[in-house]
Amino acid sequence: MSSAKGPSIGIDLGTTYSCVGVFQHGKVEIIANDQGNRTTPSYVAFTDTERLIGDAAKNQVAMNPNNTVFDAKRLIGRKFNDQVVQADMKHWPFKVVSDGGKPKVQVDYKGENKSFNPEEISSMVLVKMREIAEAYLGQKVSNAVITVPAYFNDSQRQATKDAGVIAGLNVLRIINEPTAAAIAYGMDKGMSRERNVLIFDLGGGTFDVSILTIEDGIFEVKATAGDTHLGGEDFDNRLVSHFVEEFKRKHKKDISQNKRALRRLRTACERAKRTLSSSSQASIEIDSLFEGIDFYTSITRARFEEMCSDLFRGTLEPVEKALRDAKMDKAQIHDVVLVGGSTRIPKVQKLLQDFFNGRELNKSINPDEAVAYGAAIQAAILSGDKSENVQDLLLLDVAPLSLGIETAGGVMTALIKRNTTIPSKQTQTFTTYSDNQPGVMIQVYEGERAMTKDNNLLGKFELSGIPPAPRGVPQIEVTFDIDANGILNVSAVDKSTGKENKITITNDKGRLSKEDIERMVQDADKYKAEDDAQREKIAAKNSLESYAFNMKSSVEDDNMKGKISQEDKKKVVDRCDQTISWLENNQLGDKEEYEHQLKELEKVCQPIITKLYQQGGMPTGCCGDQARTSSGDSSQGPTIEEID
């Protein structure tokens, strides 16, 4: 974990967008991607020839809706038959199938049918974020802090950590998004006296509320609440449904089964939603949306607010719950801090402001970047950064859900209550329920309900070999140990024999096994190698193409009249035309083929060009050596595509 392995980065792995930061020279840098954007879409696309991640994937989604995967965060750590997954599948153009109860995404890639775990898709986004950081820092990066919604449960956290491992990262820590944002806010403000801060984090797919007390670099989380399935995408869904109905009314046609039309509509809705945060009306103009029909319409802010009113109002429930859990009154909150792109919606701000009796909300930190900013600071601390502004920082986070075991009658007995500061270790003694009972089944649950059947089973194990004894005599000591990532280990010991059994909550609930992860790491390397090969191939093709066109235009240039013999000119032009037509028929050739064609073409052109140079006939700026410079460079030709 030393800094010898290069800098440590902080990654905000978002539902819709991700962001990466690094702490160096005493401050955090949020790193822009190759398109110059400081956030990158959490999208992965598969085509016949390549895999695209980030902006490139999102930009081609309308043409390739079935094979462009997003929202992996809404799948990760969940079961296929989870109601949330089933409801989401109605909105997704890509196919989700069940593999032993776990959801997998099915796509066509390079002409084959492939299926990926949500962890693998997330790992591809993480690899992209790592590469963005490496390009900026100019060195390899392996250590990272990754953030998750505070309300993520054990399986979702563990699956996110697995995604980091598949991406080849050493995950220093999984931290909660609102806590990371609070670090960003605390660093920004430099607080010395105690302040109670409420972080209201409404992103693309998740919603969290956390209350922290910040004093002198100590960040203590008092309570957390939220909804792992509420965010900007749900507002987009409402808009999409509204316009599908409008199209039906106006044109008597149903576009809901046409994936391309729906995707173009969704892109327009996302744009309109953003516009409505600053204007009172937004227009939607989509040419030839469906069966040649243009769709021109508009939506007012008031109508949008009415459409989403239940979702907007629903954001206040977790605020009330967090206040109750923290045993605070709203008057005791000093600062209400907005995080996440969806907090730009004026109605959301107004509801929150009214709830806090007209208090000004704090908008001083960038809502899109705050989480990555805080994660970068935490990464620096965990890798031993000694900068004065971070070395005294202490983070005390909490467990979002109660953890316990099932006792007689299906009762949930909590050992670690929700909002307990982590890491934490709790031990309790239990006994047998019947005479001469040879063993006990320890079933571990998370949740707040009184009966275990209403809570989430994390895993179970048996402690056997208990010596025969009347009921109530044996003493079985159960220990719950939750680490700083919020991940749980449970052990049980029979006091009379000293016999012990333990479990790290793993495979019972859809976690990937060690073998799965190792296989996925190898797959990830393989896909990366394929991506690199594809890039090199395109570079070779572009070199050949530009060399052929350059040569042809050079010898056909008016300035060359009288300087080049007709015979030489014909030789070059014919050979270039031949190459250009070969290229048109060999768009999917190998890198070696393109390089071979370039050599053959150079054999014809080079002697003629050299002769011209010696005669001083080559006009300046006419690039005979053009291809030599570009073939080593992986610059691609123009790749422009309609976005909607």
From Swiss-Prot:
It comes from the Eukaryota. Keywords: ATP-binding, Nucleotide-binding, Stress response. The keyword Hydrolase does not apply. One of its GO terms (cellular component) is nucleus. PROSITE patterns: HSP70_1, HSP70_2, HSP70_3. InterPro entries: ATPase_NBD, Heat_shock_70_CS, HSP70_C_sf, HSP70_peptide-bd_sf, Hsp_70_fam. Residues 617-644 are annotated as: Disordered. Disulfide bonds: none annotated. GO terms for molecular function: ATP binding; ATP-dependent protein folding chaperone. Signal peptide: none annotated. The keyword Nucleotide-binding applies. Residues 627-638 have a biased composition (Polar residues). PANTHER family: HEAT SHOCK PROTEIN 70KDA. Belongs to the heat shock protein 70 family. This is Heat shock 70 kDa protein. It comes from Oncorhynchus tshawytscha. The gene is hsp70.
